[in-house]
Amino acid sequence: MGRLTQLAALVYVAVAVFACRERAQAVQSEAELKDMVHRMMPMVAQTTGLKFKREPLVLRRSRSQVRDYLIHKIDQDLPSTELAGLQSALRLFGLIPETLDLRPTLIDVLTEQVAGYYDPDSNALYIPEDVEPLQLRVVVSHELVHALQDQYVHLDSIIEQRHANDRRTAAQAILEGQAVVAQIPVLMPEQKPDTFPLGWFWQQRAAMAAQQSQMKQFASAPLWLREGLIFPYLGGADFVVWFRHKYLGRSVLDSMPQSTEQILHPERYASHDAPTELTFAAGEADTVEWEDNLGEYETRLLFQQLLGNEAEATTLATGWDGDRYQVLGAKKDVLVWYSVWDDAAAATRFAGGLQRAWAKRRAGVQTGRRAEVHQMVIDGRPVVRLVDAPADWKGWRALPTVRLSGGT
């Protein structure tokens, strides 16, 4: 999902619209838009505790220009070979249908959802011409926070981490979460997000999803894509509120969470519970076509997709401490996934759930494939390995192995 959430900053944050839309003032001309940005900057600076070092540009774009920008960013971030690898991984996990073509799906969904974006390369806010005037204050206030963030942390360096899906997703959650929390008092000065009960933003997920489900492309997208677009905003906002309570006066940008586990369980961040790193040993079993990790949040989504029960998915993914997978073979038809767990009980619970999920995934399908879920201990740590590959895959004779490092 980190690949996806690199683009999540482009997606219109609908949360604030519920409360703010009626009091927004219509803005029509580009001059009025620039004036809005200038007037909002002090408020954004105050609510974030950061000062603007420079004023961002603000420019209008047609919907076709927005689509062209999205295509450019997707192709830049995911060149064709990497896109093919990611698409194969998502298909092998069952997170997207075998027939789904990822690139046009991403382009269509994001084009439909975008209502403004900040581009670090040009230090500019871009507002589509077809955005309703009453939505502009919501869009501008959110993207202004991203412009300010870019003056303190290098946004591109955060979102361009390679093969570090979970860490990117966690970082994106901070960027989007801070923008959501910061824009609320800008739009509604009487509202104080720091007084919201912990978990309040995540509780708005159903309402946000319902609103977005009225959009054709979003409604027909896979669960992985729909939930992946929402998580950085709502999960990130809840973490930011927690952080502001816990670390009064500190900037959340100074010490980013390292995993979605830390976003989902802020106490893990406070206790410096860093994820365990898994590294595949060099071998000759097959050609590595793609490698990355899921993280706790996408592991939840995997179980939610395969078992259809969100509460059970949350339980099965809890206790995650690190994971790594490879897609192997010229046909990109082999999946090897290792995960390490906090304790043996969590590993056993996960392994049992994964066996049930995979049996359900492959039930009644004659695929000529073989799948194994195996528990083991590496360096004293409980580990679970999933292998799903053609039955005649040569790598079955000598499966890839991993080394563990770090973690707490």
What function would you assign to each model-found segment?
Residues 40, 150-156, 160-208:
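Post-HExxH zinc-binding segment in Zn-dependent metallohydrolases
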Residues 35-125, 129-134:
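Auxiliary, metal-adjacent structural segments of Zn-dependent hydrolase domains
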Residues 321-408:
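C-terminal soluble interaction/assembly domains
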Residues 44, 138-155, 179-180, 240:
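Active-site recognition of the HExxH zinc-binding catalytic motif
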Residues 21-23:
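Bacterial signal peptide processing site
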Residues 53-74, 162-166, 197-206, 257-261:
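Acidic helix-start/capping segments at beta-turn-to-alpha-helix junctions
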Residues 214-332, 338:
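Pan-zinc metallopeptidase signature
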Residues 125-141, 164-171:
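Short pre-active-site segment immediately N-terminal to the catalytic Zn-binding motif
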